[in-house]
Amino acid sequence: MNIYLIRHTSVDVPAGYAYGQTDVLLRPSFEEEAEKVKESLSGLTFDKVWCSPLTRCVRLASYCGYPDAVREDRVKELNFGEWEMKSWEDLSSDPRSEAWFADWINIRTPNGESLKDQYDRVSSFLDETRKSGMQDVCIFAHGGVLTCARVYAGEYGIEEAFKNVPSYGEIIKLSFD
C-alpha cells in the first residue's frame, strides 16, 4: 500500500504562533503553491482521498481535483487548546508552559492535546486505512499529521518529531507491505 500525504500550502499567520486546529486563512500565494502540488500529483490515481476538514486542506484538495475528498477529523493538526493563536513568546510566560516544553510528547496543552494524543489518533486512522485493502490513497493534512505518519512508519522516533516538520505543500509517500 502507498499512502501519499500532502501538507497544506502556507498560511497567513505570523511566524511564531501556535495555530493548530484554528481555521486560518491561506497566503495570497495559494494558487501558485497549489499548482506545484497539483503538478506533482499528475499521473497518479488514488483508490480514495481524504482531507482534514480545516479549510486550508479542503481548499488544496479541491484545487488538486479532489473536491469530494472525505473529511476526516483524525487528520487534523495538533489541538493547542487555550494556546491557539497565541505567540510562543507570550506562551513562555504562561506558568503551564514549563511542563509542556519539558515533555510535549506526553503533556497536554491547556484544554488541548499532547503530541502522543495526536500520534494516537493519526495511527488509528492509518491502521484502519492499511486494513482497507486499497493500494494507493492520498491524505491532505497538516505538518503534525505528516510527522506523526513518518513516526508511525518508523522513519524516526517521536522525540524527533519537531525536528522533521515538512514544508508547506510537501508530499511524502509511505509504502507498506
Task: Write out the residue ranges for each language-model feature.
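Short, hydrophobic/glycine-enriched beta-strand segments
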Residues: 2-8, 139-140
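Active-site-proximal alpha-helix that buttresses catalytic centers in soluble enzyme cores
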Residues: 6-67
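Glycine-rich phosphate-binding loop signature in dinucleotide/nucleotide-binding domains
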Residues: 42-45, 129-135
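Short beta-strand scaffold positions
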Residues: 51-52, 120, 140-141
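Active-site signature of alpha/beta-hydrolase-fold catalytic machinery across serine-
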Residues: 63, 148-152
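Phosphate-handling substructures
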Residues: 64-121
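A glycine-rich beta-strand to alpha-helix segment
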Residues: 135-146
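Domain-level recognition of soluble alpha/beta enzyme cores
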Residues: 156-177
